[in-house]
Amino acid sequence: MSRVIRSILIILGSVALYTKYYLSFQNGFIDLLSTMGSQGSLAGLQSGLRSHYTGLDPLDRFLKACNVFFWPIFHGTSPALSLYAIAFAGSMIPMWLILLMHTCVNSSIVEIVMINALAGLLVQGIGPGVIMCVLLAMRNTSMKEFAVTGIPAVSILGPNDLPLSLVVCYILPLALSSLPAPASISVPSKQLFIAIWQGWPLYIALAVGIAHSLRNHYRRNRPQQLFRHAYAFALACSIISHVGLLSISFLSVSPQSPFLSLHSADLHPRSLLIPRLPWQEVKITSLESGVLRFLHWDYSISSTGTLLWCYDVYWKDRMRGRGWIAFFSLSSRLATMSLAFGPCSVALALYWAALSNNLMKSENARKR
């Protein structure tokens, strides 16, 4: 099944390029972003776009474009967009953790830091819809290597190091970027926080490397213990954000909904949860609608690709040799769980089931 999954991932990456970038040129979204950038304006503000961040002109231009794109998400001009972005942000944690855990096979701590920093920056800069599918298509879905190595490179880390690095390097910058401006912070400061948040994959990779060096003389932990805390944390973030999105969206349909007066049409499940099909494209007239459409496809494709890849990992490890009945039975259960708890939550659970099984085999083999 691996060849089929790899082909599907490549197709999904191509679809992401088409829906996110090609159609964004066709429907006027890229032109709208460029116009706002050249005019120095932000969604909901006529001016105030910050131009200087680092002193490096290419990097400053990139961060300026990031602020134009992300401003309506963090500024809250569209409740539906901000709500969907929260669910997307929650799903990024299990996606990143899956990449990190799989990179740990036969890798030194330097390789782990460099690979995840580079991969994470590509995911943040281009989008997980394209990069996650490409990265996963390049990775082997076999767990045999885990049963041999037992992930020695990162076993020196403490069990709370990974969750703490996620909180400090990813969630904290997100929270600071979400502070209301100008009520709590100034508009330039909010833009600076948004710019700082763009580097979260690099910060996490560096935090892992620093934690490893500080614990160089510590007793090694069991790999299951190390990743169990990170797994539980990532799963909780993903489930809470997804269930929150579903709850508010479906509550908006009720006549007694507290969200009825708050853009209830935008919060309707049909508008908020289902991306507009490519042949239903319309001209983008507002930045908020363009960003939401962009995130729709980015989230849908990246989460689908991650789920399919983890499904293949789990099937190879736990279900090899089963027939079509087992395949369709498992697929139907996973589809239901994905709708209820989020596809990235289910993907992480599948991956952890296969990983923990092989780590336990590795530990038992070393004890003999």
From Swiss-Prot:
It is a multi-pass membrane protein. It comes from the Eukaryota. The chain crosses the membrane at residues 10-30, 81-101, 118-138, 192-212, 233-253, 334-354. Pathway: Secondary metabolite biosynthesis. GO terms for molecular function: isomerase activity. Belongs to the membrane-bound ascI terpene cyclase family. This is Terpene cyclase ptmA. It comes from Penicillium ochrochloron.
